[in-house]
From Swiss-Prot:
Residues 325-366 are annotated as: Disordered. It comes from Encephalitozoon cuniculi (strain GB-M1). This is UPF0329 protein ECU01_0130/ECU01_1480/ECU08_0060. Pfam families: DUF3654. It comes from the Eukaryota. InterPro entries: DUF3654.
Amino acid sequence: MGVLAACVLGLLGGLHGSRVEETEEMEMMKEMHEKALDCRFDRSKMEEMERSLERTVGFDTKVLIPVIFHGSKVVASPVTRYWEIEKEERRYTERVIKLLPGLAWHLMVCVYVEGCGDWISDLTHKVFSATSFWRPDLVALYKNGKKRDGMKFVDLVVEVFRRNRCMVGRFGDSLARLAEARLQRISGSLSPGERKKEEEMLWKIKEYGERLCTEKRQEEIVKAQKIMCDACAYIWGRESDRRSFLLEAYSKHLCLRMVDPSVGVEGLLAHCMGHSKLIRTYEEHQVDVAGELVLQVFLGNKDIDDESINNAVREVRERKEAERIRKEEKRIRKEEERAKNEEELLRMVESEEGKSGEGEEGCRRG
């Protein structure tokens, strides 16, 4: 999925709201993308892209990128604790945090199916709204970790996914039942081809809802986001990777603002990424390979495949080998330096002893 498609996905998922003015920086980035893609981003083009995306996204699994932008500034990174946020940015960050349950919810369950968007979207909002009475104060939760070992932003994101999990089964059951009911009342006026297409899509929706009812799928959704957060924290700890990651994230952030310039509270970005392959990679190779994999597919605007996994494994292996060689060369240099110093010290001692011996001999002669 390309940069703009991923950004429109965020828009369709309800990731942003309220108004901000387009900046000169946005316009410059827009012109760069237009030149690179050889097209103009007028409103009709954006609407065409949105319609195209609605036809193609389907049942892709998604993850949330744990970074908060405000304009051109990163106000909360994956590893940011509340007390580390600049004071003038805290109120804005709190507004974004209050949106987190809804942002996460859309990514956890929402699908975009041609001709079925309204009733699925209505169900998504209905189930989410029905549980609003017990939803905790996330800002207070984040604030309470004021100590140096307090809650990082990635911890807060994962906690939101964990708490949303209780709604997934309820949504899945309702989705499956509604799809079954619609199967029973497909219009007889449809042509055989249209009827077949409608039946196939409703069966897919029904099966998707039934999968959401399983403990396995619910656990997979939360686990994939946890791994994504761990991977982003790992990427953030590597300066060169952090720069590449930030540049791509900011590019997508600006694209989303170009798609809908009415955004004001700039929510988190989404990325389509296969949950099962991400989890398998993490379990087989741990966080360094998972981090490299996330970086590669995020920069490449694509989903995980076997080739990207193999590339990540190879990259980490080569990096570790280069680091091992570097450390070994450093160790050898230190040993050589120490041996050289010891040799020099020994010569100095021998020289001093020689001078001392000559002095004593002279005294005896005197």
